[in-house]
Amino acid sequence: MDRRVSGKDKNLNIVIALIIFGIIVLIHEFGHFLFAKLSGVKVVEFSVGMGPRIFSVKGKETRYSLKLLPLGGSCAMYGEDEDEDAPGSFNSAPLLGRIATIAAGPVFNFILAFLVAIFIVANVGVDKPVISGFVSGLPAESSGLMVGDEIEKINGRDIFFYRSVSTYLFMNQGKDITLTVKRNNEKQTITVTPMYNEEYSQYMIGIKSSGYEKLKNPFSVLKYSVLEVKYTISMTVDSLIYLLRGRARASEISGPVGIVNMIGTTVNESKPYGIFVVLLSLSQMVLLLSANLGVMNLLPLPALDGGRLIFLFLEAIFRRPLNRKVEGYIHFAGFALLMILMVFVMFNDIRKII
């Protein structure tokens, strides 16, 4: 079968990726925008994208813009990085209002992820961590685990999805795995040593999933939608820890170009199964990317929402703001470093593609 992608399909995939990026960024910035307005802060410009404007319209006090590079967005608030306390400025708003305004962006990303998760869980169901069988010759077969066991914990950590086992094995590269399972309403604890599988180039213990189970109770759908978002957030945090420990190579890091390529691959692989499967697959990407953006923006780094929250929390502790000009310089330096990192990641993405 010829799996080559036509130029027309590539262009369509890029458009789809840009729409997904746009929606996620729009929701994030709208969170900032809404709470800025509620806190009495004047929003100078609300934009999707970066770089020069390609379209804009001026409202009563806010300019709404679409910019050339679809790599981010902004909600520029009056006096945000300046020593400015005039009415309507960011610094003139109550401290709690400023904290809510900054935190709202990531929170709105988590809300978007939850809404998308409802759609996915309602239509696909959940992969409950119930063992349906074993792979011959792999450790789980002789470990004492049994068909029908429901895995509740991995090394003391609660799990709710079968895929959590694979995630843990990848993150811990061959370390012993202690499973707490429920069997006939009793709990058993069993330790298994993973075995490296040359064919799949990964560590495995050799258990088989019972597949996805459709949920009939709407409250169960809501419960597992929350757990889906929680799992995605935890996976993002674990991946960051994995990266900081030096376990990931630079070639494994993806940025916007790599994500566009990944979205294109998702569309192409799901297209033969119909438009609804394509929609479900893209919804998975929106869930993953929106939760990722929420987590990444909460990192305590200059220029990110997390870095700005640190300064606001320090203001709450010391009951006075730190030097705002210094804070502005710190955020500017952080932004410059983030741009350098983005260029590196984009170069890395392009190198992998070509």
Which residue stretches match the model-derived regions?
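Alpha-helical transmembrane segments of multi-pass membrane proteins
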Residues: F21-V25, A76, N109, A113, ...
